[in-house]
Every structure is written in structure tokens, then in C-alpha cells.
Amino acid sequence: MASSLNELNLVQVLEQASNPQHIRSDVQKLAEQQLRQWETQAGFHYLLQSIYLNLSNSLQIRWLAVIQFKNGVDKYWRSTRINAIPKDEKASIRGRLFEMIDEQNNQLCIQNAQASARIARLDFPVEWPTLFEDLENLLNDEIIRKDSVKIYNILMHINQIVKVLGTARIGRCRPAMQSKVPLILPLIVRIYLQSFEEWTTSSNLNYEDLSSLQVSYLALKVLRRIICEGYDRPQTDQSVCDFIKLSVSHFEMLISNHENFKKFDIYEKFIKCLGKLYFNLVTGSPANFILLPCSTQILITYTRLIFDKAPKVYRENSDVTGDFWEQTAIRGLLILKRVINFIHKKGAITLKARSDKLTIDASINKINTEFLNENLITRLVDTLMEWYLRLRPTELENWFMDPEEWINEQMATSYEYQIRPCAENVFQDLMNTFSELLVPYLLKKIENDASKLSNSLDDFLRKDAIYASFQLSASAVSEMVDFDRLLIQVFLPEATNTNISGDELRIIRRRVALIINEWSTVKCSEESKSLCYKLFTNFLTDEDDKVVLLTTVQTVRTMVDDWNFNKDTFQPFLTENVHLLLRKILPSVSLTETRLYVLNTLSDIIIQTKPLISRDLLVEILQIIPNLWEIATNNASEAILANALLRLLRNLVSSLGSQSHLTWDIAIPVVALACDPSSMQYQLLSEDGYELWGMLLQNFSSHDQEFDDKFVELVPFLKYGIETHTEILPTLLEIIKSYALILNPVDFFSNNTFQDIFKQMSKYLLKLREDSFQLVLEIWEILILSNESDYENLLLQKFYETGVLSALFDAIFLEEAPSSYLCSQIIQIIARISYVNPDALMTFLATYHDNLPTSNENARMPESIRKIVSKDQTYDSVVNKLLTGWIVCFRDIFDPKFKKVHILGISSLLRTGLVPILTEFSSIASLWIEMLEEINETNRGDCEKYHLNDIVTEQSIAFHPLTAEQLRYHQLCKNNDPVHNISLKDFISQSMEYLESHLGVERYQEFLKTINPSLLENLQMFLSIQPQEARP
């Protein structure tokens, strides 16, 4: 193995690394190791360039050398990289980048061109300011221009360079490129014209001599990139305008001579490239495109093609004759669509400069006067309805041959790739943009044309196209049409007419379903929807054609998902529809996409009609899951079904509610697989798995079933999720919240996973997103409320060990304090703890004080963690800062319930007898008076105002079924929250009695003399007011 880096040794190592005889051998491994060692040495990349430029080296050596070179540019070209290529070596490399222009191997040249483009992206214009001048000199070289290989290779380099520079949106290289491209544009136009002339006029051109054809196409491709990326306002550059005008004449000539030129494979690429040029221009800026002098000619050319070639497009079969005319017509329709949308929005785009408004106004005026006249618009509508909205013979053939595959394509196909969906989209744009002209025109046309049709299949397909136009124009014509009447008088009779052939009936039933799919969300009464549900139930029962069945399923799903869906209207048909989906449709389909669609439809119906589906039917739906889950998790091609099954399970659990334990045998193993970080399916399924897990816990009811220990076995999976999935942290915290409500504190805190998670949350408390922050505080509050007297020490001990208490005090003592709203929420947890055990809280505060940094250490800390307290300060001073901050935050609390929580907490501190707390007695007493003035509690301590934001009320239970968890939380608050169970007056009286007992009668009286007499009088007055009657 060579050890010193030189060209000869490098060639030898490259040969050993690339020789097929050495594949996976020790020789190859040692060679690759040597290359890795050399790649950080100065001169390595220059030698690689020398080797692949040397034609005497073998192709395999040169190939590996250029690949190594290109990868090295990515890794080491930037000067900021470790082991960056030296500046002088980079200059030498740049000087030879274009020496490969006589390379005969196309793939090698492409690799070099890509490397050159990457270097240009990094070095132009600062380190390589002459890039475009260098290209200009090459293009001007007479010798090079006469050599088709050299000129082709230069164009390949320019294509890659412009492509890469054009994608840059930050930095100077794109503006610099735009200032330089005028140097090379005329030269490339000259090359294009010369080569285009050669191949289009030569009578002897054959398959062996296609160099001019190749050069011409590549030059056109480069020009397309330069014009679209190199000019912000192409209409202002004469060279660009001249070329585009010329290109339109070439486009027309190529289209008109299709029969002569179609023998060349590259011919279609010319048409597509020109179409892409015009499409990219209109997409980049419709106004700039319209203001091109030849824009009207482009639009007229494509519109004429759409008119004239419509019969060819209609009869074209991509499997037999190709899809040239279809794709060309699609490009034309997409260009028209962009222009129509621009007119519809009246140029509503982001203006970058004041002149943009003038440009937009000018372009709209031009397009309306030169192109979009009434005759053209109505002829477009006629042509679309006559040819492009009609089902084509190839479509009918595919429908009858493989209906399931065909309907899947119909539901999934983008309008940019198939002619009929594209035509439908453009038709809708026309109707919405020119509604004043087209709505009366269309309605009259539908009425007149429909009456003239015969019984032939061709006319039947025309009728389907007429109905399609009615379907697509729903939004535009809804105010002028009585759809409810048409449904009864026209569409329902058509869909149930058994006097026509089976093929025709299938077509009309599909169309009626699609019409309802569109109109049901626009204008359709509940009575009409009921008729539609009845019709669809009959379709699903009697029809066997999968296209009709699945179109019906699609429409049912649309109606169920509509914001205006009324489940009571659907209820009479609900059970039968679910039965049919479950027992007929799902077993009959074989494609993954179809199963997925049916499963998602079932999911939507379950959740939208909750709680109308019976328990038995929900359990029947549940039984389909195990078999499908087995297929989805063991077959990669069916894996996408697993997520749909998880969502279906989640909705079943939600719908079953307190009976959701019936899903446990299936759901718990599914959650275990989906949420286990070591599972192969984890990345794909975990998010839906966590949501299902949460739903199972939220719907668990202890009245119906004991809690399964398997749920506790799942808990360790949460830790990995918390650490790695910050985007779904709220979902994971909701799961922990559910466990906090279900488990008793001993079981909860005995689980190490929860303790580890609390440590994480404590560490990042103030960095959490608001929703996660709220949930963390809710969990801690639930644990405090769940606390029984026997668990009091355990709770505080665990809060101490997991850093919860430290996190709370850290947050409120920050120099850069959070908002008073956040502070009040944090202190609310302290208030809860204080009420439970104020002495323990103050003991911890003393420990916290002992562990604080000194004032000097604190001053050296980053501002974000610097505190207003330090070890140098007295403990009394720290307590005083706590109380002062607490009272300030209290002023921003407006909910009476939360006010009482804080008052109970801060008042409980009086029981510690600490001097700094007693010093604040007047402030605390003022809070008592303010609160007593605002509320009037029952003897038990409850009050209407404490229930203003309750989820569980008589009204909510009547209108919205609540989960077991919501009821569980409500019961916890009702039974354990002192806000609802401790009379504030009694609590105040007891606090005063405690002070008297603690201080002794004499000291107590002395203490009262220090308090403002009027404050004590007001307090005594409020304490004497009788409470209101307790609520039953």
C-alpha cells in the first residue's frame, strides 16, 4: 500500500479501490482506508482532478476520481471546514474545471459539471468573479463552436451552474448571476438557432447523426433556466423577448410537423421544454409573463391546440399511442389556469415595489383586451364540456377491467397529471372567475344540450359531461339553482332508472354521487340529505360495481365530515351503512389504498355520530382489527394501514366510553408495539399509538372494570418519548396526567419513570411551550389534591427529590422574572403545598436558601438564570421576597376560585409563626377582606363563582357526553379541593385563633395593636355576615 501522496500512488490506490476483482476484499478495504487518510491532505483534490482529466487512465479509475473529487468539494471546499482545501489549490482547480469539454463519456462530464456548479455556488462572485466571463470566452471560441462534443459539454456545465445558482435565495450569488447572464444569453441563443436550423431543415438527418438535435435541446434547456432564474423582469430585456417570440414560432412549427418529427425520441422533450419555459414564467410572475410582447401569441397557440387537438386527446391511449397530446394539452390548460387565477384575484400578490402595482394593472388590462374576450371564454367552456370533461374510451376500459384500481387513481390523481381532472379544475376556475358571463350561459346550455341527446353511448357520455359541469359549478351557480328540486325531479330518478343498460346505470350513479358530493356542502337541505342517505344505502346494498360503491363511500364521508353535519338526519341509516361498510365493502376490496379509505371512513362515522352507534356494533367493528393489524405489521406494502387502524381503535375507545375496557385485549398489545422504542414500527406508529394510549386512560371507568396492571407495564415507554418527541410532548403529558388521576400517590411515586420525567420537566420548566407548561402544573396540582394525610410526607419528599420544589422557587426568584400570569400559576402550586404543610414548605425554603450561590457567584451567572436572592441574604429576607412577589402576582388573578387557592396558601404560612410572615399580616388580611367582599360562600365553603369554568355541569352533561377522566377530575376537585370544602371565614377565624394560641394572649393583643384598626373592623364585619344556603 502506498503511503506518500503523489499522482502515481493515487492512481494505484484508485485502481485497487475500483477494480471489480477486489470487491469487498482486504485490498479494496485498505485502498478505501488510504483514500480517507489522504483526503484531508493538501493537494489531494488537485491530483484527483489531474487523474480524471487524464484520458490515458482507465474509465473506472477516472470515474472513481471524479466521484471522490465531487464529494471532497462538498466536505472541504468551504474555508471554514476542518481540513479545508487550501486557497491556492482551489485556485488551481478552478483554472482547470472547463478542460474536460472534449470528454466523450457523458456520465463523467455530468459529474464534473455538478462539481463545477457546487464550486460556483461557494465561490461566485467573491473568489470566482470571472465565472461568466470565462464561459463567455469559451462560447466565443470558433474552434469550440464547430465541435459538437465540446459545445455540448460546455452547455452541460452552464446548465448545472445556472441551476445551482438559481436556487440560492440568500447571499450575493443569485443577484450577481442575474447581472452576468446577459453576457452568455445571446451566445447560447446563437448556438440554439444554428443547431435547431440544422436538424429541422436537413433532409438527410438520421438516427446515427443526432448531434445537432442533442445540442439544440440542451441549449434550449439552458435558455429556459437562464430566462426563468436569471431575469426578475424578463419583459424588460429585448434579447429575452426576442428569443421567446422566436421560441413560439418554433413551438408552432414543431407542433404542426408532429408527424415528421415524432420519430425522434427527443422531439417530445422539445415540446415539454418550451411548455415548461412558458409555465415557469407564468408561475413565477403572471404579470411579467403577460407583459411579454408575445404572451398573447403563447396563449393563443395553446388555446388553439386545446381546441384543435381535443378529438386526438380524447381518443389517445397512453399504452398504445402514447400520451403526447394529453400532456401538451395539460400544459396549456395549466398556463391558462395561472392566467385565469391571476385575473380572478385581480393581481392580489405581495408587492415588492411601488412599480409592481403599475405592472399588475397593465398586465390585467392587456390580457382582458388582447385575449380574454367573451367569445373565447364561452368557446373554452364548450370545448371542455364536449371533449375534456367526458369520460374517455381508455378510462371506460380501465374502469371495466380493474374498477378498484381505477377509482383509486381518480381519488388520488393530481390535476396536474391527467387531462380530465385538469380540465375539471380549469372549468371550476372559469366558472368562479367569469360567473356573471358563464352562469346563465351554462344553465341555458345544460338545458338545451341535454334535451337534444340521443340514446347512443356517445351521447350518454356527453350527458355525463353535462352533469359533470353542473357538479363542478356548484359554488358559482348555487344562488340561481334549486338543488333540492333538481335532486328529486332529475338526479334521483336518473340514479334509480333501471330501464337503461347496466353500463350506463353505473356511469350515471357514479355521477349522481359526485354531484351530491359537491352540492351537499354548498346548498342542500336536511330533507334532501336524508334522501341522499337513503339513496346511498340502496347503492351500497344493491350495487356491485366497485367504482359506484367507492364513490358512494367517498360522498358519505364528505357529508359526514361536513361542518354542518347533523347526525340525527343520518341516524336512521347509520347502522345499515356501518354494516355494509364492515360486511360488504371492506371484505371485497383488495388494494391497500382502498382499505385505508374505508377504514378512515369508518373512523369518521364513529366519531361524528358518537354516541349513536350501539355497543354491539362497535364491538363488531373492533373484531376486524386483529387480522388487519397482523397484515399491516408484517407486510411492508400494507404498513400504512397500521396508522388507520390505530385511529379507528382510538375512535372506538372514545365512542365506547366507560365500556372501552372491551377493547383492552386488542388495544393494549397494539399500544405496546406502537410505543415501544425498540419496535421496528416505532417511528411510523408511535404518535398515533400515544394518542390511543391516552384515549384508553381517559375513558377508563373504575365503576365498570378494575385497572389493568398492563397499563403500568407500558409506563417505561413514556421516558423515551418525553426525551425525543418534544413536538408531541402535550400528548405524553396528558398520559401522565391520566395516571396521576387513576393511581394512588404511593403507586404513582413508586414508579421510577414518573420520577425521572419529573426531574426532566423540573429542569426545563420555563423553557416548555405554554401547553406543556400548563399540563406539568396540572399534574403536580392533581397529585397534591390526591394527597391523603398518610401520603403527605411522601408527596413532599418526592417533590424534593425530583427537583419540583427547587424548580418552583427558581422560577419565582429569577431576576428576569416570567410574566405575573406565569408567576401566579407557579405560585399556585406553592400555595397548594403550603396549605397541605406550611412548615415543611418553609423548611425546604431554608434548605433552598442554604444551597443558593453567593451574591458574587450569582453576579457571574448568565442573566437567564441569575436570581434576586443569594446565600448572603438572611433567610427572613428570602421569605420576605417570596411574600412580596406572591402579593404582587395576586393582583393579576381574577378567577375567584384561584384567588381562594392563593389565599388559603399564603394564609397557611401564618401557622409557621415566622416573623417575616407575621410582619405581612396586614397585607394578608387585606386579601381576606377583598375576597370576602367579592364572594358569599355556603357553610361548606363553596360558592357559585368557584364553578364559572367547570367542565362538568348539568348543561355540559346533557349536551356533551363527558369522559370518565373528566368526571374523575371533577370528583377529585369536589371531594378534595379545599376551595370547595373549606369555609374561608372559618379558615380565617381558625388562623386568628392559631395566632392567639401561638403568641399567647398578651403578645397576641400587642400584635393586634400594630394592625390598622379599620382593617380589623372591616375583617370583623365580613366574618359576621351569615353564609348563603348550601347548594343541594
UniProtKB/Swiss-Prot annotation:
Query: Which residues does the UniProt record annotate as the domain Importin N-terminal?
Result: 31-103
- Positions of modified residues (N-acetylalanine): A2
UniProt entry keywords in alphabetical sequence: Acetylation, Cytoplasm, Nucleus, Protein transport, Transport
One Pfam short name = IBN_N
Principal cellular location given in the protein's record? cytoplasm
**The keyword Protein transport appears for this protein:** yes
GO process annotations (BP): protein import into nucleus
Q: Per the record, GO CC terms?
A: cytoplasm; cytosol; nuclear envelope; nucleus
SMART domains, A to Z? IBN_N (SM00913)
Q: What SUPFAM superfamilies would the database entry show?
A: ARM repeat
Q: GO terms for molecular function, please?
A: nuclear import signal receptor activity; nuclear localization sequence binding; small GTPase binding
Its annotated compartments are: Cytoplasm; Nucleus
Superkingdom of origin: Eukaryota
- Quaternary structure and partners: Interacts with GTP-bound GSP1 and RFP1. Associates with the nuclear pore complex.
Give the family this protein belongs to, as stated in its UniProt record.
Answer: Belongs to the importin beta family.
Q: Which PANTHER family would you find in this protein's record?
A: IMPORTIN-11, IMPORTIN-7, 8, 11
An additional note in the Swiss-Prot or TrEMBL entry is: Present with 6300 molecules/cell in log phase SD medium.
Described function: Functions in nuclear protein import as nuclear transport receptor. Serves as receptor for nuclear localization signals (NLS) in cargo substrates. Thought to mediate docking of the importin/substrate complex to the nuclear pore complex (NPC) through binding to nucleoporin and the complex is subsequently translocated through the pore by an energy requiring, RAN-dependent mechanism. Required for nuclear import of Ho endonuclease and RFP1, and involved in rRNA-processing and assembly or export of 60S ribosomal subunits.
What is the protein's given name? Importin beta-like protein KAP120
Q: Which organism is it from?
A: Saccharomyces cerevisiae (strain ATCC 204508 / S288c)
The beginning of the lineage is:
Eukaryota, Fungi, Dikarya, Ascomycota, Saccharomycotina
Underlying gene: KAP120
